[in-house]
Amino acid sequence: MDTPDQLSLRRYGASPGSHSHDHFQILLGLSGALELEVEGRGVRVATGGGCVIAPGDRHDFESAGGSLCLVLDSAHPGWAQCASSQLTTALPTDALPLAHYLASALQQGRPLAQTHGPALLLEAWLAGSTPHTSLHRSTRQRTID
């Protein structure tokens, strides 16, 4: 993918047929449910769910009742850490409100959402998949006198 990461809002309905991409495709469910087949495995992205499709994975989709997804097309190698054999997951805690904000910002034409949104989504997704470290035990903290 020669172009920069691209965020978009997409409404899904009937299937256009099986296809693949040369980049990661990240789907974040905002409303409805999207049924996918990725490399022969069934995947469902419902509201609050997400899916990372790896480059080259053949996939097809359908949404009988319609669905709205925030979609990121990205060649960033960091998404490889998020792609898994499970494919679909509940969005990490910080990713869902971020996805809603980015969707609103895209609709309102806020350019910084397109510029910085892809990196923020990756950061939020990765943060949700790694153990959290407590800030309360920092060596820099001391009691207040």
Where are these regions (language model features)?
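N-terminal regulatory/effector-sensing and dimerization cores
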Residues: 1-86
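A short, Lys/Arg-enriched amphipathic alpha-helix from helix-turn-helix/homeodomain DNA-binding modules
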Residues: 92-99, 103, 113-145
